[in-house]
Structure formats: C-alpha cells, structure tokens
Amino acid sequence: LKPGILVIDIGGSGIKAAVVDEQGNLLSERLRVLTPHPCLPSVLIDTVVELVAPCPAYNRISIGFPGAIRNGLILTAANLDSREWIGFDLPDALSRRLGNHPARIINDADLQGFALIQGKGLEMVITLGTGFGSALFRDGQLMPHLELAHHPVSDNLTYDQYLGNAALKKIDVSEWNERLLRVLDVLEVLLHADHIVLTGGNVRLVTVDLPPSVSIAPSDSGISGGAALWRHRT
C-alpha cells in the first residue's frame, strides 16, 4: 500500500486521528482521545504522538486546529487554555516528532469542511462543540477564514459563548436549539448560503426542524478532509 496522509483533528474536547489516502478514504480506524486541559503545546504534542503510534505508514501530515491560522502559525487558541499557542509552529513541532514528514495546518472547521461540502455554490460548514467553528467555501474552494467564534451575535455574547459548551452549562437543550435557529437566521441574512452543514460533537443535541438548505453530518465524518490540504493551496 502507498503511504497515506495522517490526519490529526484537534478540538477543544477531543483529538481524533486517522490515515487516509489522497481521495480521503480511510486507511485506518479512527482514533480518539480527550483533549488534555490545560493544553500546553508540549502536552498536546505528547498526546498526539501517543495517539497515532498504532497508525499505518504515512508520508504527510494534515492538522486541523481550533483557532485562526496564518502562514502555518497559530494566531488564536481560545479553547486550549494556554497563551503559549500564540505564534506557535505546530506543523514543524509535530513533524520533528513524527518522522520529519511534511506537515500542513488549517483551521479545524476548514479541514472538516473539505469532507462535507458538495462543491457547488456558496457553502458553509459549522462545527458545534466546545466552541463554534465555521468554514466558508465557494464552488469547492476555501474562502478566507472567518473566525465568527469571537464575533458578537446576541446580547454581547460571541458565537462561542452563545452556542458553545459554556452556554449548555447555563441553558437547557431546548433553549440551545432555539439559539441555533436564531443563528441560522442571522447567517441566512448575512450570507444567503446555498448549503449549510452542521457537524461537531453537539449536533447530537439538535432536535428542531432545520431549514431545507441545512443538513447534519456526524461529528467523525470530517476527518477525511485532511487529504484536501495536499490538493489545494490553503
């Protein structure tokens, strides 16, 4: 078998990994471990190295990270509880621990989005988990990343605070669902997207009827998007 691409999807609650081929098909089982907290870079790297030890051969690494990325460096990491992430070169650090294979990094919602979009029109992928992640695509091409997570949406609450895990500690699931519908209304006015995909660990909580243009994808279905980092300039 030709060596695959190791995909590491880092979230505020969990870290997932698998090896995929160039089309994104799984070559290994999906592995998962809880994200350590507080999550310093050295702690996360040790956790990832241990997690991926059973993986079959790979010669490239794709990383999805819960924050804003520019030129391979991390700009924000609000859900990982450490300022050591700011400016950190995670691809280089992981590459040195994992056989010096070339590594690329992208926002985690962007990574998952490549696996979930249809490739036609204006599409948005929203991850509902520890925080609120978003990715925007036009005709299959990734648009400049919009970090909506930290933008005010209602009563001076950011999207993270309004729909993330912090909100679920204060409101019941019914109210959370109503908030989700209000956010979808806001995004409809803002973007008029042809298709919106909801994914992430908290999509299991969605009970309301969604607009026809909105669909749900299982939280583990996006990892194959890591193959796209080696097909597209990101």
Predicted regions, residues:
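Glycine-rich phosphate-binding loop plus the immediately following alpha-helix
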Residues: L90-Q112, Q141-R179
